[in-house]
A protein has these predicted regions:
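Non-heme di-metal
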Residues: 1-103
Length: 103
């Protein structure tokens, strides 16, 4: 379904942004603490966007199941692969964010 592809692309964009901002926050933490805090906050906001978009994907899949039954197996496999990859990205970002908070 095209809408799921669009939403998963948006999720990946948000994840990439969150990672970029978290890395920059770590890079500037010592010399520019105010900037680093701002970048960290932007990173956490991007992760909130990821969660909101994921909730929308879940809702679309649920609506499809109610109206048409299970999605085709190939589509489900692709979505699961993308979802697992996104979960791994989110874990790495949370590690970066944790390093910022603890460091």
């Amino acid at each position: 379904m095209k809408i799921i592809k669009t939403l998963t692309d948006m999720i990946e964009d948000e994840l990439e942004g969150a990672e970029h901002y978290a890395e920059c926050a770590l890079m500037y933490k010592e010399d520019h603490p105010q900037l680093a805090n701002t970048l960290y906050e932007i990173s956490t906001q991007e992760m909130r966007h990821v969660n909101l978009l994921h909730e929308e994907v879940v809702a679309v899949i649920k609506k499809h199941r109610e109206a048409h039954g299970e999605p085709p197996a190939a589509m489900q496999e692709i979505y699961e692969w993308v979802h697992i990859r996104q979960i791994e990205m989110a874990k790495e970002i949370k590690i970066l964010q944790s390093q910022f908070r603890e460091g």
